[in-house]
């Protein structure tokens, strides 16, 4: 991007950069501000596929993850089906990104019922953003002058088609590593590089051979495996100095593996004396717990490893575990505050009414119609009189509506806990909310 601006004289406003996470987009923008200045960086479009599609589509009703989960639960309940609502949402996402119903493990009746309920509420989910943006571009109206795509190996079919449409009459730059394509379960395919090469024979390919991440020992161990992938020989030069050898340990079962990891971490952090360390033939370098990471392929393996670590009093933090966000009370609280901030979001209101006040569907529908029509408090009070569930809800609305735009998210959660009681999940929500300036960032 800097080369386009500094060497080629491209105007910043003609540049669009696509990343895969909001964090990556923020880091990219910050680095460009430091190099090119805030004014130049502010004119560029930098964001995820979903963020850019949302900007193109304008003001649309976007369903939150909590509301989508409630909608999936409702779909299964109405159809009398058992199963995981989260698995249903994962299947829906795969279908919307190009997979067949069979491949996604989704019955057509369930698929149709979920989509119908989403449409009834006038809402879109995150995958719909990409599909709608692609439909919007049917006439080639959305084309960026200079499009740059990060982590190209992670894109799925819909995203590939967006890239092709957005760069139809402009320049395209993609960067990625097909050997790091690990999101096949979400529809990603590392062969997208071969596909792009076939569609654009004029493209210029630049191979980055200097590796800044791994020691020579790691590269030497990985090379024989990676070279079996399509694409020929990889000649990577390590930039880092030599380190310890890569060790491979075979365990008879998962439990033995967990026990070994716990003992090994104990040894590395000073859990055995010097004589034992010398007998094992390992260097005596005491590590901090924060120096060590354990990667597992499945959540089930992770739970067993965590159990073994805690048994040996080894402190650990499990990254990526967000079970508390699936808690009914947490989802209800988030949906309630979302409904106050976004009155036009009917799914948020129905989710809050169902989870926090066990409100029947017919009463929730009544409240939704009144709320989305913008009825004032006096009209709402008159309309809900005699309906206990809705009277409780309206009391909470009158109590919290003045504060929702003024208070920080963690203060709102703390206030909720003080008034109505807390739970471990709500405590985690409050601790997480400290890192967010506004509730909208938590959706």
State each model region's role:
Residues 1-30, 148, 153, 157-174, ...:
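Conserved motor-region signature of P-loop NTPase helicases/translocases
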Residues 2, 54, 73, 93, ...:
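Amphipathic, well-packed alpha-helical segments that form the structural scaffold of globular domains
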Residues 4-143, 170, 245, 365:
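A basic/glycine-biased coupling hinge at the interface between accessory DNA-binding modules
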Residues 35, 52, 59, 78-82, ...:
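Phosphate/oxyanion-binding loops and surfaces in catalytic or ligand/nucleic-acid-binding neighborhoods
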Residues 65, 103-108, 126, 186-189, ...:
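Generic alpha-helical segment signature
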Residues 65-73, 262, 350, 410-413:
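An amphipathic alpha-helix signature
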Residues 100-102, 225-235, 405-409:
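Proline-centered turn/helix-capping motifs that create local helix->coil transitions or kinks
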Residues 288, 302-310, 327, 334-443:
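Conserved helicase C-terminal RecA-like lobe
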